[in-house]
Amino acid sequence: MASSSSAASLFATECLLYSTASSSTLVGSMGLTTVAAPSSTSALFTFKGVSDPAFHSVTVIPTSPNPAISGTGGLIFQLESNKAALNIFSWQRDHLLQRIILPSKLSCIACSPNGDLVAGGSFDGRILLWQIATGDLLASFDAHYRSVTVLKWTCDGAGLLTGSEDARILVWSLAGLLAPHDQTSSSITSSEHNPAPYCTLADHNLAITDLDISSGRFPHQAMVLSSSSDASVKLWDLRTRSLLSTFVFEQPIHRVVLDCTERFFFAATAPTSSDNLVYRIDLFRKRDASSRMVETKQATTGSQFDFVTDELRGASSVEAHGFGSAAGPTTERIPSARDVAHRAESNGSSIISIREPISSMCLSTNSTSLLVGSVAGNLFVIDVSNSQVVRTVSLLGNAKVSAISDKNAVTNLMVLPKPRDLLGHWETLSSSGTGSSMSGSGGVGGAGAPVGIPVRPIASSFGHHVLASEEDRLSKPYLTRISGNKTTLAFDEHNVDSFIDPEWDSHLVSSELLGRSTSALLSPSQTQSGAPPSTSAIHAQAALEAERLQRENKLLRSQLHQAKAINDEMWSRLVQDRLSVNQVDSE
């Protein structure tokens, strides 16, 4: 029987990527350690040349796990604080891989899950989107009225969420960001325009501090958790674009993280709060025993008796909480630790006290450990099962206590599998003989020099301007998958959920309507015959319909251009006449 250690070796070690801010006595740092035994003095990896990473300024492109093609190495993007520069690191070396000058200073950054795109938010509310391999600036537009505080991609990379100090959350579909000219007719007469958001979530009153997204597909299966300085956390449904529930706290909330199975979430108070607390809010709670176990019934004779309900016989005694109701969004007040009376009545929340102000927070992959970073550079490891702090570690290395201040905050925490291309890892070594190159594997062949897994291509520079003309924008297409797990999409398959359509919802359309949408493409003779249409006939009718729509679209465009030319000529003549009249009057 294989031992537990050998079984554990089949899975990647769970690692923690952390960053700390700079102060007058200590420089900022960024490193990788294990979640099971975190340490900064004996970390797995420490990066050199890190420049004061701020909050939401570090993002990771994971190493490709495909062994058939050797995969591609992972990348780490880090914004320089107060500079329009982006530092790029690789797991295969500890020093800087590339430094890119940006068009402006950015406040936050986020890479898409597939590693093809990187989005940035500026201090003036602008959103920028680059393609990493080519450096093309695919989108650049004013989205918010104030600084962008956080960017989050959905798990499938089909949606981007932006939070700002203007108290709004904007949700963008990738299709709308890449092709905004297809959304409005104003693009015909203007080369510069903003894409339309999929939806706007505007129920907060103060700045958005953090966002977390569930693991569902965008938009039909995704939920969003948002925190704000207005001391509230809100749960949103992207499919219906609606607010599900609001949780009101006593202090402003700085960080929020949702369990991977959506059972609960954690909310951490802001560093400026009087109490350093982490709240656990359960989204599934046990029902009251008095209402679910015994009920009173009245017999036909008039006497009353008690009997055991189905819940006590083994049926579910847990109910969902916080996902809204038939009457609309729900609101729940979360009592503080000082409110003893209400804390005793609250069975859906618990409080974890931290001895230092909280700056960052994340959950382990399986939600067994909660990792909390403080403003003093310490990491608190909390057991989720009992809400106890099991370990406290300093992430400032061998720094003296006198040199540590409240400015050395842990700014970013991310849990990820141990990278395959990590420097010193056995997969970055190649064998010169027939034996194995794994350390301690007992291979007879000698190990050759380390050979790194190929790093994904990065442009030498990022574009500062979006291509103005529509022809130039379309000459460099960006490929994106629009059809679920299938590589091809047949016309007669009504898998509408696989498309990103902000107005379409298959749950609101009957099968009869779907059948009529297919018959609308058929000729009257085919419809009256009653015979099932063939695939070729459907494709032929669809091609004719598409050709007709293209002709009509071309005609409308030409008419619009003519109308615009007439309008411009009338305007110019009016201005010239007015100027000539003013000139005569002045003489």
UniProtKB/Swiss-Prot annotation:
Disulfide pairings: none
GO CC terms: nuclear pre-replicative complex; rixosome complex
Pfam family, one: WD40
Gene3D superfamilies hit by this protein: YVTN repeat-like/Quinoprotein amine dehydrogenase (2.130.10.10)
Keyword annotations: Nucleus, Repeat, Ribosome biogenesis, rRNA processing, WD repeat
Membrane-traversing stretches: none
InterPro entries: G-protein_beta_WD-40_rep, WD40/YVTN_repeat-like_dom_sf, WD40_repeat_CS, WD40_repeat_dom_sf, WD40_rpt, WDR18/Ipi3/RID3
Entry annotated with the keyword rRNA processing: yes
WD repeats mapped onto the chain: 101-142, 144-182, 203-246, 353-392
Region forming the signal peptide: none
GO biological process entries: DNA-templated DNA replication; rRNA processing
Source superkingdom: Eukaryota
Localisation: Nucleus
Family as reported in the entry's similarity comment: Belongs to the WD repeat IPI3/WDR18 family.
Function field: Component of the RIX1 complex required for processing of ITS2 sequences from 35S pre-rRNA.
Quaternary structure note: Component of the RIX1 complex, composed of IPI1, RIX1/IPI2 and IPI3 in a 1:2:2 stoichiometry. The complex interacts (via RIX1) with MDN1 (via its hexameric AAA ATPase ring) and the pre-60S ribosome particles.
Official protein name in the record: Pre-rRNA-processing protein IPI3
Lineage, top ranks: Eukaryota, Fungi, Dikarya, Basidiomycota, Ustilaginomycotina
This protein's encoding gene: IPI3
